[in-house]
Design a protein with these regions (language model features):
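Alpha/beta enzyme core
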Residues: 2-175
């Protein structure tokens, strides 16, 4: 719907012209124009993302770049998404934690897109945006040393209580 911004250089130029503090994108976009623009605007390389070709779609994030590649193209920060609560989240947590440690060793900042994905989180309301559940995801993000966390604003609370049943205990509550 916006073919002009399928061009990597146009994405970076828009960020510069718009007065953005940085531009976050993939290895392909940033790598295509890093020599020309990495000194003009900070680059944040998002090293994992979904592939959305598998059917049915699944909530998994796959590495498409390394931390070394991010550093080599002039990025000052790296970012990743973890889908907390998904069947693949344990693997994602370990992989991203290791990548963040490598980034910090190279002096780079880290950003975590911190989202919940689990069909059990939809009951009478959508608890993917519950303050208690997203708060736990944020806590895990800080634990793996994310410098910045991007999270959806809470729209409700009580996700643990709503999902927890006697037959299927879930999480930890004080009730």
């Amino acid at each position: 719907k916006n073919p002009l911004y399928f061009d990597p250089e146009n994405i970076v130029r828009l960020a510069i012209e718009g007065g953005c503090n940085a531009v976050a994108s993939t290895l392909g976009v940033l790598g295509a124009c890093s020599r020309r623009y990495a000194h003009r605007i900070p680059f944040l390389l998002k090293f994992n993302h979904n592939e959305f070709l598998s059917y049915p779609n699944k909530f998994d994030q796959i590495f498409f770049a390394s931390i070394r590649q991010a550093k080599d193209l002039g990025a000052v920060a790296v970012g990743a998404t973890i889908y907390f609560g998904s069947p693949e989240s344990s693997r994602q947590i370990v992989e991203v934690s290791e990548a963040f440690a490598a980034a910090h060793e190279l002096g780079m900042a880290t950003v975590l897109w911190c989202y919940l994905r689990n069909p059990a989180f939809k009951k009478d309301q959508d608890y993917h945006v519950a303050a208690d559940l997203t708060g736990q995801a944020n806590h895990l993000g800080v634990t793996i040393q994310a410098d910045v966390i991007k999270q959806k604003l809470p729209e409700n609370d009580g996700g643990y209580l709503a999902i927890n049943t006697k037959e299927n205990p879930y999480g930890k509550t004080d009730k």
